Amino acid sequence: MYGRRRIRIGYVIDTWTWVEYYAGRISAVQEYIENNKFDLFTSVLTLTEMINFLNQTESAHTSLRVVHEIGIRSLVVPVSRDIAVLAGGCKREGFRGGIADTIILATARIGNHTVVTGDLHFKGLPDVLFIEHP
């Protein structure tokens, strides 16, 4: 008898989502991060954005602790040559996000994953799970 193989869903968590998660503002964000049915990935650029964001209001120690926790909750994906090339293609196709957002999108696409975000730059893209918010 052949066993059934469970295919897990992979999500790339972007900076907006991590910020909302740690701020505790949007409960829908928690569903994706805390539900262990999903494989979570985070672009290494998201870590840079998180440190930059957190350093505005938090201590360096807190910023590093949060980045460490992100690394525990998700697989941190470095920017490979393939991701960089694909990101360039995303910009050519008209994606209006900045370079970091473009690399996050390419990270998801190269792994056949879905970006989880509420960032308006991503709204309407087919490989994005957009979280509506006020």
Predicted regions and their residues:
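Acidic, PIN/NYN-like endoribonuclease modules and their adjacent C-terminal/linker elements
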Residues: Y2-I9, L105, R109-P134
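Histidine- and aromatic-rich ligand-binding microenvironments
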Residues: I13-W16, T42-V44, R96-G98, D119, ...
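Active-site neighborhoods of divalent-metal-dependent phosphate/nucleic-acid chemistry enzymes
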Residues: V76-G118
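Alpha-helix capping/helix-boundary segments
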Residues: T17-W18, T46, I83, I103-I104, ...
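Conserved beta-strand segments of alpha/beta enzyme cores
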Residues: D39, L75, L129-F130
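Short, well-structured N-terminal submotif of metal-dependent ribonuclease cores
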Residues: M1-T42, F53-H68
